[in-house]
Amino acid sequence: MVKLSTIVVFCLTFFVSIYQNYISFFMPSNCRFYPTCSTYMILSLRKFGVIKGIILTILRLFKCHPLHQGGEDLVPLKIKDKSEY
């Protein structure tokens, strides 16, 4: 049986892929990060699941402003637990 979280990850990844292939094609490329935010979302969803993937993506989007220099911002290898702070 397929888990609900797997289905949600698939659906979100599908919609982001539609955005990447059909909608962003008509918009000028101005992403200041590598990988792009849409690719970052797909990677974080696949690696950490729905909740943590969305949180990581939102935190990434908060960095997207003119005062941030951008550059390489990869999905973390692991997320720190509260006990590691």
UniProtKB/Swiss-Prot annotation:
Keywords assigned: Cell membrane, Membrane
InterPro entries noted in UniProt: Membr_insert_effic_factor_YidD
A Pfam family annotated for this UniProt entry: YidD
GO CC, alphabetical: plasma membrane
Subcellular location: Cell membrane
Record has Membrane as a keyword: yes
Signal peptide range: none
Membrane topology note: Peripheral membrane protein
Keyword flag Membrane: yes
Family per record: Belongs to the UPF0161 family.
Role, per record: Could be involved in insertion of integral membrane proteins into the membrane.
UniProt name for this protein: Putative membrane protein insertion efficiency factor
Provenance organism: Buchnera aphidicola subsp. Schizaphis graminum (strain Sg)
